Every structure is written in C-alpha cells, then in structure tokens.
Amino acid sequence: MVRMTAVCTAKTVSPVPSTRKELKGAIAELRKKLNAVILAHYYQDPEIQDIADFIGDSLELSRRAASTNADVIVFCGVHFMAETAKILSPEKIVLLPDLEAGCSLADDCPADEFAAFRDKHPDHIVVSYINCTAAVKAQSDLICTSSNAVELVNQLPKDQPILFAPDQNLGRWVQKQSGRKLTIWPGRCMVHETFSEEALLKLKIMHPEAKVIAHPECLENLLELADYIGSTSKLLEFTEISSCTKFIVLTEPGILHQMKLKNPKKEFMDVPGIDGCSCNECPYMRLNTLEKLWSCLSTMKPSIEIEEGVRQKAFIPIQRMLNMKETQEASEH
C-alpha cells in the first residue's frame, strides 16, 4: 500500500505575495534557504517551467531526482512522478504542490487488478511504463519511459514473453517498432485519447507544409497520420533539428512553450480535442500553480511518503532501466 500524506508542521505561514514578481522572488528565496530543487515536466504551465531548475520528460526528471544534491525535491508534475523521485531518493523530502495532481493512466491500472493480470502470465517479464503507481512499479521487472521503451524491449531476450503496462497505445507502438509480440494491459491516457482526427485533417489541409509530430500515447489512427513519433523530449529535439518551420503537435500543449522558446522563428499548432473541447490539456498537470509551489515550500507539505517495502521493490525495476540505458549509451561511444 502506498501512502501519500501531507506532513504537518507548526510553522507560521506568511501571506501569499501579492504580485507575480514578488511570488517568484519568494519562491527563489525559499528554494535557496531550503537547498531545494524544482523539477518540472514539459506539461506544466509556462510560468512554472520558467521558474524550474530543470525541465524534462519522465526519463530526464528521473535521472535528475536520482542524482540531485538538494535536500528537498519539489516535483511540479503529477503524483506518480513525485513517487518516482521518492523511490530514487528516499532520504530527500519530496514535495508535490497539489496532492490531487493524479494521472488518469495510472488510475487505469489498479495494483490489485494488475497483480491478478500478471499472475495469469507467470512466464512473462513485466515491463511497465513509468506512468504508473509505486505499487505497480513494485510488481514490475523493468520500468520504461516513452523515450526508451523500444530500445529497452529490444535489449530483452528474443524468446522472452513480455507483458506491457499500463498504456495500450504506447504498447501497440512499441510492439510495431520492435517487432516483439507484447501482452498489453488495456490502459489509456485521457488526454492523448481525445485528440480529434477530423481537426487534425483540417489542420493538415490548411497547412500542407507542416509536419505532424505525435506522442506514442495517441490513438493508432492518429499516429498513422504523423510524420514523426516520439516522447516529449524527442518531439522537442525534432523541432530543433528539422528544417521544417511549421509543426502540428499531437501531445499535451504544455510542451509548446519550450518549442517556441527554442525555435522562435517556427510555428506550432496544437490539435483540439473531440468536438473542439479544451480537453487536450491535462487537468491534473494544470492543478499545480505558482501559489501552490510557494505554499509547499513555505509549509513543507504535501510531502510524499511510500512504505519502505513497496519503495524497495519499486526501486529495482527503475534502477534496472537506468542501468540498461546507461549501458547502451556507453556501448555507442
């Protein structure tokens, strides 16, 4: 069982600074005083990205969490990311600005149901996408991210059956790219499943010179229309090295902030959700705000706590991922 608790203190909290400038200044002061590091995912609001020490995808942020010298990690993302930081750095205080910042994909894979599913396939190695709870990670043999899923699967023995969880769209894409047959848990991301194919086709007609870039959590019919598929960090990298000056982006639009900063002369368009709704934004990622970031540094809560037995079991497949990735990188040099 995983506990996510708010650790109470008797500390008196000052009023919230009244201007954005004062708020950012107060956050910077607290960060220095507490020897804290602020990690932010690409899907966070731009003003949080701008104040973060490091911005990245799940793999990059996992590495930062494992190697930081800070005493306090503030994870501006969702709770499975903060859990991962705590798993890798149990001696650190790990704060999440809003404890309600969950994940529909992680919620789609309850630990008890996953255990029953895994027990039906005892000969399979369990590869779990990092977008899952600590309790599911603890039942896994190897953790992957969308950045490294294909290459990690390719490193596994060819005769080894593989169970992949929890994202079925990513699983299908990994299966196609690797040529490996995967037994796939039927989970999905509420954001990446809501992009409108009709809206995408209209954008392609209006901007025939634009390249469509997509995250592999998208539905297969949308991936078939993409010119390039990759994780958030790889999508960002592609926009920098491509000679194309216009992109249609199929992932959570928070990434557009970094794309525009790194490519000020290029144009980026996000794809609306079905029926033109704004559901292409992750409601959980958007729960974190500068005010909540300041508050968690001021009060040192909410903090992430994980039962040590679960943490130790979850650490093994994450560390295995990091070791496999490092081994491959070393062999390429």
Swiss-Prot record:
UniProt EC number: 2.5.1.72
Segments traversing the membrane: none
Cofactor dependence: [4Fe-4S] cluster
Reactions listed under catalytic activity: iminosuccinate + dihydroxyacetone phosphate = quinolinate + phosphate + 2 H2O + H(+)
Main location (coarse class): cytoplasm
Cellular component, GO annotation: cytosol
GO biological process: 'de novo' NAD biosynthetic process from L-aspartate
Molecular function, one GO term: 4 iron, 4 sulfur cluster binding
UniProt cross-references to SUPFAM superfamilies, sorted A to Z: NadA-like
Origin: domain of life: Bacteria
Cofactor binding note from Swiss-Prot or TrEMBL: Binds 1 [4Fe-4S] cluster per subunit.
Binding site for iminosuccinate: H41, S58, Y129, I130, N131, S146, H215, P216, E217, T232
Keywords per UniProt: 4Fe-4S, Cytoplasm, Iron, Iron-sulfur, Metal-binding, Pyridine nucleotide biosynthesis, Transferase
PANTHER family membership: QUINOLINATE SYNTHASE, CHLOROPLASTIC, QUINOLINATE SYNTHETASE A
Entry protein name: Quinolinate synthase
UniProt gene name: nadA
